[in-house]
């Protein structure tokens, strides 16, 4: 039995992994460290240099950008400005302060700028402030304007040279083409058509002969024939090309690229050079140069970002050789979906590109200022305008598709969000254009991107998740680790291979049986070759072996026990639903885990980890103080009932005691969804698989009342309510307790400022913050103004605009934050005061809530039964959940059944000696002969408990307190009906399943409206819960009522309940007064129809039944007349006013 990291878990793993799971946040943190050139990055560089490795870039991201832009010269070349030695000062505020005060967690960036007068040689040097640069928190996130955000890594096509084959349907010929794609600059495309001529497209413009390009580069016909004469396609192309010499070719290219402009030789030469040979305009980037060199077998230096003449010639040669039928082993077309051709743009690179963009804009400003300012007076400070750089960075973090609002539903959701790979976004694919191939699982994804975890909707296959052991190399390609095999023996060496390096080798699986000396136990080994081909070969032909069975899946997928027994579609749902799990009141680690839980919880960053070994000196609910062994003391602050981005509750609690000895890296406090340092997303519940009176038909779930009473599945949700007092044209708004026309009992919980007290219970419509807004007053006459000046201010007319609890929300006030301009808080323009109220709500589980297992088995609670009515076991234990067995076979997620049985074994404990000799032999692999009740077990993915092991353990489970073994090797128990006490006629599968409560809570979805807001345009009720809208009675529903002949119900729905403006005011009055409902009037939509017909010059007259013409008036006239008759004051916004009713 392999030793598990968590000592409390007994593992069923047979394979001992030679490699620890790498830091799960390294994708984010290492990339950002490289960008800013942090100390951590400098240490990694030194370590790589010392060990002779080249897997760490030796120039930081910002340094690269400043080097690229330096020097900025004026148009005459007499002055230049260059940048060097960037540095950061410490951030002004901590992460917590930034979250509280709606600020960005950033540090001031300074750079040394040198202005050189090239005529005199004079140098002026200054340290220039380049703006506040957002910093990454230790958890791999950014705090932007007080909210936590994640920059998602982007999966893009790598720069380089790509060869493609397509079939011409008319001639049934293979046509070859090639694209040279730079990181930035013009594309160069070569193609051979069905007439065997070789063409070129420059910058996606019109096609022309490739020989024109060669002549423009200075080749004459003799030289072209000498190099390409053996290829018929090039000879045909040359014959059809009528350009004479270099000048003619250059002009021909210029005409194609700049039609309508008069060509000259010089401008044509400059154009061509700027397109491909000018580093300012064209850049392959290091990765592009690496790919071009690799494909075309060139030895050009990696820092040469422009194309060389040899690059172009070798590319043409390669494509014509492909067309001529060259040896496929040497010359092959590229697969664009292969991970050797797709790379990752990590956080650092994305921000670096944005800084580069800002500096390019700044460069233009600097050049202009150089020409306009006096040379003597110029200093770097006068030339530099940092606004474009600051704006560029701000724009990226605030609005980019890749800077996303962090998913903080639970720690796993946050961890997965940071490890996400997104093929969408700027420079990537679009949902509409992405076909099936790019979304599909590719053999090169193995160990790099998870084939399971991806969204179900239109983004399927475009958004993925990094595999557990994968890492990104300096070129942006994903690498995965393999154990080196030499002469049929597995060595201790571990090599990290990219997808195209891996294609050259033969790899064995991680579960291939090995002897103690590392040699293969069998004569034939199952291996994987290029393109995912599988075969058996002798051991001495094997090059590499997988490091772990779970290396192909992501973290979330690696947390599904018995994944190997689930259909991939259901495993996908299981992976995604774990991320929607709500933190419960009391977290409980799964009885059946995979051994991934502790590592995932630690790297997610929501637990508190001790930095150095020491002794716990002091602790409370809010902090833990550790005295380190070196004599230093550190206090760890704990987050208490903080709201997450999704409204779930973030709360940390200590799991150590005063005087405990703690080690470096030990978890000392649990966060949300963690139990004793392990990820704990749900609860272990006793489940029976049986139909129950049809109430669990179609995935519906039956639950025991015990789970409601004991708060087993209760969760805390925190909502933030905000109100601001602004300056209006009529005077400032005021936060006050003095609200007009409001009873004193309504204000009972408000303090003297008009803000609710902490601890108050609030329900819908209750005032949280009292606020009044000045009402418009008529212009005063001079006499009135004089009287007012003498006798003092008359009470101003104000209206109540207080912050109230929205419909459907309630709870307890747990926090109030007040920001005011007077206290020096930064507030938006025009805002004088801002109040935030936090309301916490305990939500018990209720019918309509969604529950799920980890195997894609999900359902909605249909009925909550009293515990005494639930089916019960022989010893009287009632089950917690009844699931429908029909949900298992066709969905093929058998993992849930195995989890049920193993969960029972873990809950009851086992003693193998109690089994027969036969079972003892089968269970030898487990290692733990006995386990007490409630023992947690780990069954790692693809290396977990086998069916015969579970069957054997079921036979060996410990008896209950009465000495009865309730469940035998079949895994089924005798159940009794809780209502009658009669036994069911058949045995039922019973056991423990880990059940998650998902964020799709019925309280957030259920909605009803009586009267509410109407659309300004159609005068019909708005739609949706957020707008407090109505339910749409659509076309098909109207047909249904028509079919039943329900004319009055239909008339009511189409008029007074919708857009008969006058009618609905009258109906409201009639209901209030208890009178009969009046006849409906004319709906607004009918008037719109008439207006549309009039706009088509059709004169429409509406006649009553007795032939009298009905006059169509504007709604405003109707409303005001009706309002006047009813005595409604339309100037006040109250529920009885027309705007609201």
Curated annotation (Swiss-Prot):
What are its E.C. numbers? 2.7.7.6
Mention any Pfam family matching this sequence: RNA_pol_Rpb2_45
Q: Which Gene3D superfamilies match?
A: 2.40.50.100, 2.40.50.150, 3.90.1100.10, DNA-directed RNA polymerase, beta subunit, external 1 domain (2.30.150.10), DNA-directed RNA polymerase, subunit 2, domain 6 (2.40.270.10), RNA polymerase alpha subunit dimerisation domain (3.90.1800.10), RNA polymerase Rpb2, domain 2 (3.90.1110.10)
Q: Which domain of life is it from?
A: Bacteria
GO BP annotations, alphabetical order: DNA-templated transcription
Q: What class of enzyme is it?
A: transferase
Q: Name one GO cellular component term.
A: DNA-directed RNA polymerase complex
Keyword presence, DNA damage: no
User: What reactions does this protein catalyze?
Assistant: RNA(n) + a ribonucleoside 5'-triphosphate = RNA(n+1) + diphosphate
Q: Which GO terms describe its molecular function?
A: DNA binding; DNA-directed RNA polymerase activity; ribonucleoside binding
What keyword terms does UniProt attach to this protein? DNA-directed RNA polymerase, Nucleotidyltransferase, Transcription, Transferase
- What HAMAP family does this protein's entry cite? RNApol_bact_RpoB
Function recorded in the entry: DNA-dependent RNA polymerase catalyzes the transcription of DNA into RNA using the four ribonucleoside triphosphates as substrates.
Oligomeric form and interacting partners: The RNAP catalytic core consists of 2 alpha, 1 beta, 1 beta' and 1 omega subunit. When a sigma factor is associated with the core the holoenzyme is formed, which can initiate transcription.
Which family is this protein grouped under? Belongs to the RNA polymerase beta chain family.
Q: What is this protein called?
A: DNA-directed RNA polymerase subunit beta
């Amino acid at each position: 039995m392999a030793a598990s990291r968590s000592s409390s878990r007994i593992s069923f793993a047979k394979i001992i992994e030679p490699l620890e799971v790498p830091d799960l946040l390294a994708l984010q943190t290492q990339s950002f460290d490289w960008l800013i050139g942090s100390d951590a990055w400098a240490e990694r560089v030194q370590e790589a240099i010392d060990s002779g490795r080249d897997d760490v870039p030796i120039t930081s991201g910002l340094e690269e950008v400043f080097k690229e832009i330096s020097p900025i010269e004026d148009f005459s070349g007499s002055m230049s400005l260059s940048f060097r030695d960037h540095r950061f000062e410490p951030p002004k505020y901590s992460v917590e302060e930034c979250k509280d005060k709606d600020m960005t967690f950033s540090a001031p960036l300074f750079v040394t700028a040198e202005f050189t007068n090239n005529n005199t040689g004079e140098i002026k040097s200054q340290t220039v402030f380049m703006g506040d640069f957002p910093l990454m928190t230790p958890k791999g996130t950014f705090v932007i304007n007080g909210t936590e955000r994640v920059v998602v890594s982007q999966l893009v096509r790598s720069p380089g040279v790509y060869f493609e084959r397509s079939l011409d349907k008319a001639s049934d010929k293979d046509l070859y083409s090639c694209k040279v794609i730079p990181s930035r600059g013009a594309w160069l495309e070569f193609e051979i058509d069905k007439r065997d001529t070789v063409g070129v497209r420059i910058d996606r413009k019109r096609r022309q002969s490739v020989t024109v390009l060669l002549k423009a580069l200075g080749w004459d016909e003799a030289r072209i024939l000498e190099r390409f004469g053996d290829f018929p396609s090039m000879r045909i192309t040359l014959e059809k090309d009528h350009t004479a010499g270099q000048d003619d070719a250059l002009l021909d290219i210029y005409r194609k690229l700049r039609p309508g402009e008069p060509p000259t030789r010089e401008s044509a030469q400059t154009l061509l050079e700027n397109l491909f040979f000018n580093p300012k305009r064209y850049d392959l980037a290091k990765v592009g140069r690496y790919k071009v060199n690799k494909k075309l077998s060139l030895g050009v230096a990696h820092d040469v970002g422009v194309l060389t003449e040899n690059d172009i010639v070798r590319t043409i040669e390669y494509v014509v050789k492909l067309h001529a039928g060259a040896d496929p082993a040497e010359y092959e077309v590229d697969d664009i979906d292969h991970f050797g051709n797709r790379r990752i743009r990590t956080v650092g690179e994305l921000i670096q590109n944005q800084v580069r963009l800002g500096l390019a804009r700044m460069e233009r400003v600097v050049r202009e200022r150089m020409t306009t300012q006096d040379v003597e007076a110029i200093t770097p400070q006068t030339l530099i305008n940092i606004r474009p750089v600051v704006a560029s960075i701000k724009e990226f973090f605030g609005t980019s598709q890749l800077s996303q609002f962090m998913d903080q539903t639970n720690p796993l959701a946050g961890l997965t969000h940071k490890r996400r790979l997104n093929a969408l976004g700027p420079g990537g694919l679009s949902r509409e254009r992405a076909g099936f191939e790019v979304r599909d699982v590719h053999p090169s994804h193995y160990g790099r991107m998870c084939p399971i975890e991806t969204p179900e909707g239109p983004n399927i296959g475009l958004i993925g998740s990094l595999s557990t052991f994968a890492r990104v190399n300096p070129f942006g390609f994903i690498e995965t680790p393999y154990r080196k095999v030499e002469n049929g023996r597995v060595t201790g060496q571990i090599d990290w291979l990219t997808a195209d390096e891996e294609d050259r080798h033969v790899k064995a699986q991680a579960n291939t049986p090995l002897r103690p000396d590392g040699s293969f136990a069998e004569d034939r080994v199952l291996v994987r070759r290029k393109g995912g081909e599988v075969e058996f070969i002798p051991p001495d032909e094997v090059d590499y072996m997988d490091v772990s069975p779970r290396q192909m899946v992501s973290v979330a997928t690696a947390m599904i026990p018995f994944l190997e027994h689930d259909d991939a579609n259901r495993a996908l749902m299981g992976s995604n639903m774990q991320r929607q799990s709500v933190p419960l009141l009391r977290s409980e680690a799964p009885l059946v885990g995979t051994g991934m839980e502790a590592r995932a919880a630690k790297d997610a960053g929501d637990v508190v980890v001790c930095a150095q070994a020491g002794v716990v000196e002091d602790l409370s609910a809010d902090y833990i103080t550790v005295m380190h062994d070196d004599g230093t003391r550190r206090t760890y602050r704990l987050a208490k009932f903080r709201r997450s981005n999704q409204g779930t509750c973030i709360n940390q609690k200590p799991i150590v005691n005063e005087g405990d000895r703690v080690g470096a890296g030990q978890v000392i406090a649990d966060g949300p969804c963690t139990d004793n340092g392990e990820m704990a997303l749900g609860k272990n519940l006793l489940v029976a698989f049986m139909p129950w009176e049809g109430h669990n038909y179609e995935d519906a779930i039956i639950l025991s009342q015990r789970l409601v009473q004991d708060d087993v599945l209760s969760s805390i949700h925190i909502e933030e309510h905000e109100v601001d007092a602004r300056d209006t044209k009529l005077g400032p708004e005021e936060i006050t307790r003095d609200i007009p026309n409001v009873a004193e009992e309504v204000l009972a919980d408000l303090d003297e400022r008009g803000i609710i007290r902490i601890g108050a219970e609030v329900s819908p419509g209750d005032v949280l913050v009292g606020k009044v807004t000045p009402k418009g007053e008529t212009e005063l006459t001079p006499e009135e103004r004089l009287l007012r000046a003498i006798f003092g201010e008359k009470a101003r007319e104000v209206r109540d605009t207080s912050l109230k609890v929205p419909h459907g929300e309630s709870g307890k006030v747990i926090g109030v934050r007040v920001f005011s301009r007077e206290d020096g808080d930064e507030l938006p323009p025009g805002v004088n005061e801002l109040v935030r109220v936090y309301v916490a709500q305990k939500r018990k589980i209720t019918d309509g809530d969604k529950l799920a297992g980890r195997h894609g088995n999900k359902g909605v609670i249909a009925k909550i039964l009293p515990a005494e009515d639930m089916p019960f076991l022989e010893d009287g234990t009632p089950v917690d959940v009844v699931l429908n067995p029909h949900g298992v076979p066709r969905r093929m997620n058998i993992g849930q059944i195995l989890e049920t049985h193993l969960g029972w074994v873990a809950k009851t404990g086992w003693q193998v000696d109690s089994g027969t000799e036969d079972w003892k032999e089968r269970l030898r692999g487990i290692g733990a002969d006995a386990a007490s009740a409630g023992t947690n077990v780990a069954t790692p993915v693809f290396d977990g408990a086998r069916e015969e092991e579970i069957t054997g353990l079921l036979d060996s489970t410990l008896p209950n307190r009465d000495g009865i073994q309730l469940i035998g090797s079949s895994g089924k128990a005798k159940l009794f009906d809780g209502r009658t006490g009669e036994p069911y006629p058949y045995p039922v599968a019973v056991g423990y399943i880990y059940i998650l409560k998902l964020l799709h809570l019925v309280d957030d979805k259920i909605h009803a409206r009586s009267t509410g807001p109407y659309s300004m345009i159609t005068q019909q009720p708005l739609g949706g819960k957020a707008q407090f809208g109505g339910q749409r009675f659509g076309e098909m529903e109207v047909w249904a009522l028509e079919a039943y002949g329900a004319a009055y119900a239909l008339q009511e729905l189409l008029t007074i309940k919708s857009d008969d403006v006058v009618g609905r005011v009258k109906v409201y009055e009639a209901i209030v007064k208890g009178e009969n409902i009046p006849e409906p009037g004319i709906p607004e939509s009918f008037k719109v129809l008439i207006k549309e017909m009039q706009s088509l010059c059709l004169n429409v007259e509406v006649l009553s039944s007795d032939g009298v013409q009905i006059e169509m008036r504007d709604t405003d006239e109707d409303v005001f007349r009706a309002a006047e008759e009813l005595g409604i004051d339309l100037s006040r916004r109250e529920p009885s006013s027309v705007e609201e009713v």
